[in-house]
Structures are given as C-alpha cells and as structure tokens.
C-alpha cells in the first residue's frame, strides 16, 4: 500500500477540519501519516477526530509559523520522519509547513504538493513587515519543485503569481451526502437571516480568499 505523509504545523481550525475530511477518504487506499504541531486552538482530543488508521505524529519543534521557519530542529525533524516513513506522496499545509517541507525534502524526487489554506501575506490585521515576511517565505518556497493546490479560485490566482505549477480544488463539503436532507421550498417572499460561525479573523475575508 502506498503512503501519504501530510505536514501540518497549524493543526487547528480550517486546516484541521480539512485534514479530517481528506484523510477519511485516503485511508481506504493509502497508509496515511500526519506530522503536526500544536496550536492554542488545537483540541485536546484531536486524535479522536480522525480515523484510527491515520498515524498522528506530534512534532514538538513546530512552534507557530515564524517560530517554525526559523527553527533548524523543525527541518531536521521533518527530514527524519520522511526518511523513516518513506512516503510516495507528501502534502504540506500552510506557510510554515510549506517552507520547511519544501526546503528540507528532495521535492524533485517525489510527488510533493502544497496547500496555502489562505496566504498569510494577504491578511489585513498584520503589520507591513509581517506581511512582507510571509510573502518572502512563499516566494522562496515557490522556487522548489512542488505543485500548489489552492482552495479557491482567488487563492489560485495568487498562487499563479508565485508559481505556474499551481491548480485549485474548491474547498467545501460534498453536497451529494446532503441530498437526502434537502426538501423543495417555495420562493421566499421576505428577508431571511443567515448565521455562520468560525474563526474571527480578518485574514479569512471572503472577498480575499
């Protein structure tokens, strides 16, 4: 059975839910491993969210985006687990994982993929220097051999500015599983209220991503 190794420094919120859904399908055909870091929003029971066949490997040297990029031990740890697992496919998630993974591993010799999950340099609530630093991280990482898989068309357009080796798969849920719950309704004649929940962050503005 072929192996997939995911590298996810920010193992929380959107990246976490993305991996829960993705690996649920992958374990039917692959051995799946996830190298992850703990963030303040990482659930205590995170292992209970995944299929028992998923191998979760906590990486202590993953300490936030910037802290990980400038931590030599993070590169060594990713490299060490890569050699031990010997995966056929590697998928990096978010900026720090993408930078560390693409520079620590021989991407030209393997099937390597990177998903930004929202480019940090586009955030509106950070300083100019911080946005520039994240842009530089993405710019340098894009020089390595890996295919960027964006989560939306907007993110794909930004990815193409960094690397032509880019594509996108719209992020969302499989509506086929919801068809049995959908009922026909008549045209609404009055205003309706819609409530949504999620991370309160300006970096996730819909018009940007």
Q: Where are the regions a protein language model picked out?
A:
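N-terminal strand-loop element at the rim of the active site
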Residues: 6-70, 155-160, 168
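Short His-centered aromatic/hydrophobic patch
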Residues: 92-98, 116
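A short, histidine- and acid-enriched strand-loop-helix "catalytic/donor-clamping" loop
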Residues: 11-13, 62-66, 110-130, 144-147, ...
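Donor nucleotide-sugar binding/catalytic pocket of nucleotide-sugar-dependent glycosyltransferases
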Residues: 55-57, 139-182, 193-197, 202
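Nucleotide-sugar donor-binding and catalytic loop/hinge architecture
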Residues: 1-2, 49-53, 179-193
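A conserved mid-protein helix/loop that constitutes part of the nucleotide-sugar donor-binding site
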Residues: 16-21, 196-209
């Amino acid at each position: 059975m072929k192996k997939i190794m995911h590298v996810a420094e920010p193992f929380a919120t959107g990246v976490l839910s993305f991996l829960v859904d993705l690996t649920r399908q992958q374990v039917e055909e692959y051995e799946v491993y996830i190298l992850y870091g703990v963030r303040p929003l990482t659930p205590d029971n995170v292992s209970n969210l995944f299929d028992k066949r998923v191998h979760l490997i906590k990486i202590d040297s993953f300490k936030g985006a910037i802290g990980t990029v400038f931590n030599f031990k993070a590169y060594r740890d990713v490299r060490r687990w890569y050699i031990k697992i010997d995966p056929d496919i590697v998928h990096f998630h978010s900026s720090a994982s993408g930078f560390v993974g693409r520079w620590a591993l021989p991407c030209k010799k393997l099937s390597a993929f990177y998903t930004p999950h929202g480019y940090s340099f586009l955030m509106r609530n950070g300083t100019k220097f911080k946005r520039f630093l994240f842009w530089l991280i993405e710019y340098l990482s894009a020089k390595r051999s890996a295919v960027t898989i964006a989560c939306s068309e907007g993110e794909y357009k930004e990815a193409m500015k960094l690397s032509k080796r880019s594509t996108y798969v719209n992020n969302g849920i499989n509506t086929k599983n919801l068809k049995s719950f959908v009922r026909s309704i008549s045209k609404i004649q009055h205003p309706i209220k819609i409530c949504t929940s999620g991370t309160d962050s300006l970096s996730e503005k819909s018009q940007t991503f």
